[in-house]
Amino acid sequence: MARYIGPSCKLARREGADLSLKSPSRALDSKCKLEQRPGQHGAVRKSKLSDYASQLREKQKVKRIYGVLERQFRNYYKNASTKKGNTGENLLQLLETRLDNVIYRMGFAVTRPAARQLVSHRSVLVNGKMVNLPSYHVKPGDVVALSQRAQKYLCVQESLTIKDQHGSAFSWIEVDSEKFSGVFKALPDRADLPSDINEALIVELYSK
């Protein structure tokens, strides 16, 4: 299945949630009515979904937040289920260690799609070596940096400015904005991750 490249507002309306697909400096467009489904005459969202529908929607929401396709997501779940500990938390940790997500968390890109583009365009180094695979898993202790060329990009400069304005910092990541680099210190705890994600619903879905 091809990656979605249409309006981000449409995805947000489909899931009824802000998927962080737009810059934090721009609020969701006034036309992006999250209480309504996509379409010119989108029906008002039902207040109650079946258990299966709730589980499916949660999976779709998380896939769209992290920009992961169905087969990738299923593989992440299988990997998470074989690890020790809570499967749902393991799943979120795997998604958080994706290189495109780490670039986003470090503040070098305003959205995950923008971070994915930086990685794909060979603008990111991991431990001094160029990596152009967005799904590359960053390990604790890895040093992630932008190339000399990417450091001059206006979009990167603007992203760092927005990061400073919004004070977005994460305990498991240490960033040196002046050097355009950061260290992935450790896997994040569940308490450090988005509270609006209910990973238990995803586990219930795949456990059937």
Curated annotation (Swiss-Prot):
Residue intervals passing through the bilayer: none
S4 RNA-binding domain span: 97-158
Gene Ontology terms: biological process: ribosomal small subunit biogenesis; translation
Keyword list, A-Z: Ribonucleoprotein, Ribosomal protein, RNA-binding, rRNA-binding
Record InterPro entries: Ribosomal_uS4, Ribosomal_uS4_bac-type, Ribosomal_uS4_CS, Ribosomal_uS4_N, S4_RNA-bd, S4_RNA-bd_sf
Task performed by this protein: One of the primary rRNA binding proteins, it binds directly to 16S rRNA where it nucleates assembly of the body of the 30S subunit. With S5 and S12 plays an important role in translational accuracy.
Name of the protein described by the UniProt record: Small ribosomal subunit protein uS4
Originating organism: Xylella fastidiosa (strain Temecula1 / ATCC 700964)
Gene this protein is translated from: rpsD
